[in-house]
């Protein structure tokens, strides 16, 4: 059988890069076999506290960047900046960042996390960093380790922000706009030491250990190689110059280790403050254990998905935490941002998906808190807009409100938001009457589709939102509204489909980003089936759009900007559609392509990475909150999903890697629109046993159990009764407790897994790299094709 790498990673060439610009590539040796794979060449990570107003960026090198400065590390004597690209998370998913830097026989193991001293997110955030130094050699050795603070790192682009860092400070005009704590650079700052701390203009920047005693110097070098002078003074250094250096020269016997602990207040503090005293006396292990307990306790409240691939499990867990760290509590407001870095802002489009993820993950109170902030973005005319021209916000809010009710059955919430729903629908009705196409008005979103005109996706969103407005009207007994909204929906949908039919007549069925413009980026035109089903999943327009967008993939994921950049989470619009359509193999292949493009800390990105190039997202930093929410929902929907509040679907998509004798899949505490779903699947050499323990508050019409495409099924029974199989699925009674499935794997079943996908990616990258070394080219048609 022909190798399927072409489907996973190599697609027809679709990268319209200026032919005069030679592509850049990295030496494949960047990836070490003894380290977990990390796709990004310049990964950024976060340590932070749920609901705090700011977070700390763990830089590609392993430094700690805040709005006020960057603590960096050095090894050797003279000191050389430490650089360690690959990092991991404690237990694989907790927001405790770990990495090991090896210098000859000395290992420097760095562990970092953030906490507030009193456990309240509104309090000052403190960063704890432990460096454990180990001599792995067979003879004594001296370890040289140093720390120092700088304002920022080097920049190789326009602007003052360092490479792979975020802009700071930033003061928003209104809550929800981009904000960053911090200060502007000031060359007149004074620097000095006070016992165990570096002071900048009289504020503590970081605390360092005094035992063993360090060598202190205000700068790494002296202009005349003189004796260091450590009296407090102005240094007039550059923003990139490290200051406040402490160096430790430690003799270690074979197998011996030494621990150093550093503490970094996210906001500099007065040296005589009670917070500094508390930070100095705080026991790192106590706060580490509190951090572990907090997140473990939160995780055990929600959905738990376990499959026989650790990368899948850890990515699922870690990305819930990434979104919770991205949330701010400001007064009584809970502001869901996208990350604590360059996207430290509120967007209706991102937040609506993140809220849906919280609801579907078993955190309705967290979802409700975030939803309460949406109301402030309703305009006087009734529309919902968080960024100018982005009218998809109307449908996203209606959908977010409706889905929250549908999964929680919270009537108090429905009553609270319904007046704003009425105003919103009134706006839609008037907007359609005034529009020449009787659709969502022409607009310039300035993002996503990047068109000016009637945006296809805005209409899919509006229809999906209107469906949820109808549901809210019905449950609240607003029958007159429900009838009027249904009539509006029917007319709107018919008008929209007629326009789609007209437009797609000349595009082989492909639904373009704009209905009355020829340019634009694929985005909302990929939403015909999910998150609300507007068109039949098998509609020819859905199929054509799916095929047309998949033809634009590079490295197995979607592209953006006419093929110039990879786009990570945009891919999942197709993955969700494939899951619903029953395109199981495509969905599994995309699952692994998505995972390949994460860091070793399971962070996703947005775009800006060039295909088959440097794997550098530049200033478009990870982790990305919309990726986080969409990945969790994509995996959840593969295993458990609703269809139109009527059917419950189980195991829509599973990987061949999971179907091994003795292995299993477990889904626990999964909220659905029907109630809580719990099941375990155990695989044998000739089939599977499924045990269910569901608690329905509203029974589904039936349960659809999907069967893998890579097996031949010989029989299915539910609670001892034979069940017919049709279209690779079995309809189960809603009270089913035990399902027995007999099958045999088909000959030549594909070997799909995360490890295989990484291996295939690395092999293809090396192949292109070797050609690039010889010819300077890695982007011609000879290297593409299906």
Where are these regions (language model features)?
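Bacterial N-terminal signal peptides that target proteins for export
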Residues: 1-9
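Bacterial N-terminal signal peptides
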Residues: 8-17
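Terminal accessory carbohydrate-recognition/targeting modules of carbohydrate-active enzymes
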Residues: 22-307, 644-786
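Active-site acid/base region of carbohydrate-active enzymes
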Residues: 198-223, 299-325, 348-349, 379, ...
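The feature captures the catalytic groove of carbohydrate-active enzymes
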Residues: 230-232, 239-284, 339-340, 383-392, ...
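An acidic-aromatic substrate-binding cleft motif
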Residues: 281-341
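Active-site core of glycosidic bond-cleaving carbohydrate-active enzymes
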Residues: 341-363, 370-380, 415, 419-422, ...
């Amino acid at each position: 059988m022909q190798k399927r790498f072409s489907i996973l990673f190599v697609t027809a060439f679709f990268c319209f890069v200026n032919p005069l610009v030679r592509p850049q590539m990295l030496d494949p040796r960047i990836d070490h076999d003894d380290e977990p794979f990390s796709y990004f060449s310049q990964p950024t990570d976060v340590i932070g506290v749920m609901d705090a107003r700011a977070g700390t960026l763990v830089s590609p090198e392993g430094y700690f960047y805040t709005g006020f400065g960057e603590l960096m590390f050095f090894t050797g004597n003279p000191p050389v900046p430490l650089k360690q690209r690959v990092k991991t998370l404690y237990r694989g998913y907790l927001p405790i960042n770990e990495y090991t830097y090896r210098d000859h026989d000395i290992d420097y193991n760095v562990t970092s996390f953030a906490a507030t001293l009193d456990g309240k997110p509104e309090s000052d955030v403190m960063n704890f960093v432990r460096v454990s130094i180990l001599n792995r050699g067979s003879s004594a050795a001296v370890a040289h380790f140093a720390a120092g603070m700088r304002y920022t790192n080097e920049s190789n682009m326009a602007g003052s922000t360092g490479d792979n860092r975020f802009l700071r400070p930033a003061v928003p005009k209104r809550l929800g706009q981009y904000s960053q704590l911090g200060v502007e650079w000031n060359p007149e700052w004074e620097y000095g030491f006070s016992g165990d701390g570096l002071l900048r203009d009289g504020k503590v920047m970081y605390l360092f250990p005094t035992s063993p005693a360090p060598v202190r110097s205000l700068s790494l070098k002296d202009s005349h190689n003189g004796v260091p002078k450590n009296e407090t003074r102005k240094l007039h250094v550059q923003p990139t110059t490290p200051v406040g250096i402490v160096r430790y020269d430690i003799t270690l016997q074979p197998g011996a280790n030494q621990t150093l602990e550093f503490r970094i207040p996210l906001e500099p503090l007065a040296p005589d403050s009670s917070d500094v005293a508390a930070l100095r006396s705080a026991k790192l292990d106590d706060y580490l254990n509190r951090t572990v307990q907090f997140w473990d306790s939160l995780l055990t409240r929600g959905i738990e998905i376990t499959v026989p691939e650790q990368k899948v499990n850890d990515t699922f867990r870690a990305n819930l935490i990434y979104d919770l760290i991205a949330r701010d509590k400001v007064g009584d407001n809970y502001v869901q941002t996208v990350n604590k870095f360059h996207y430290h802002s509120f967007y209706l489009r991102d937040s609506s998906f993140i809220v849906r993820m919280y609801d579907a993950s078993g955190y309705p109170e967290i979802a409700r808190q975030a939803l309460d902030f949406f109301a402030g973005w309703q305009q006087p005319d009734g529309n919902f807009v968080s960024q100018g021209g982005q009218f998809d916000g109307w449908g996203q809010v209606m959908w977010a409100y409706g889905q929250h009710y549908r999964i929680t059955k919270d009537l108090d919430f429905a009553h609270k938001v319904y007046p704003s729903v009425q105003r919103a629908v009134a706006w839609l009705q008037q907007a359609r009457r005034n529009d020449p196409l009787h659709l969502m008005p022409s607009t310039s979103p300035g993002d996503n589709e990047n068109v000016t005109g009637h945006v296809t996706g805005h209409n899919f969103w509006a229809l999906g939102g209107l469906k949820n407005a109808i549901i809210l009207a019905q449950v609240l007994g607003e029958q007159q509204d429900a009838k009027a909204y249904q009539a509006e929906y029917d007319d709107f949908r018919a008008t929209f489909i007629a326009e789609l039919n007209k437009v797609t007549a000349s595009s082989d069925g492909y639904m373009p980003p704009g209905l009355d413009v020829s340019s634009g980026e694929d985005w909302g035109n990929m939403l015909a089936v999910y998150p609300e089903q507007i068109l039949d999943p098998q509609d020819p327009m859905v199929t054509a759009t799916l095929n047309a967008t998949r033809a634009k993939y590079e490295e197995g994921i979607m592209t953006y900007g006419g093929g110039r950049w990879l786009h990570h989470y945009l891919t999942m619009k197709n993955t969700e559609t494939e899951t619903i359509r029953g395109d199981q193999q495509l969905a599994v292949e995309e699952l692994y392509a998505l995972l390949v493009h994460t860091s070793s800390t399971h962070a996703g990105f947005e775009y800006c990475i060039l295909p088959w190039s440097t794997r550098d997202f530049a200033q478009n930093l990870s982790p990305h909150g919309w990726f986080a929410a969409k990945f969790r929902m994509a995996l959840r929907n593969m295993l458990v999903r609703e269809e139109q509040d009527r059917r419950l679907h189980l195991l829509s998509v599973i990987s061949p890697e999971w179907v091994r004798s003795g292995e299993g899949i477990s889904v626990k505490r999964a909220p659905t629109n029907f109630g809580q779903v719990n099941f375990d699947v155990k695989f044998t050499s000739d089939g599977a046993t499924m045990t269910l323990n569901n608690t329905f508050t509203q029974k589904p019409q039936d349960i659809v159990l999907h069967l893998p495409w890579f097996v031949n099924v010989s029989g299915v029974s539910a609670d001892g009764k034979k069940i017919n199989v049709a279209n690779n699925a079995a309809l189960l009674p809603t009270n089913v407790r035990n399902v027995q499935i007999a099958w045999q794997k088909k000959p030549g079943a594909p070997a799909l897994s995360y490890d295989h996908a990484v291996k295939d990616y690395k092999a293809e990258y090396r192949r292109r790299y070797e050609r690039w070394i010889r010819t300077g080219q890695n982007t011609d048609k000879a290297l593409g094709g299906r």
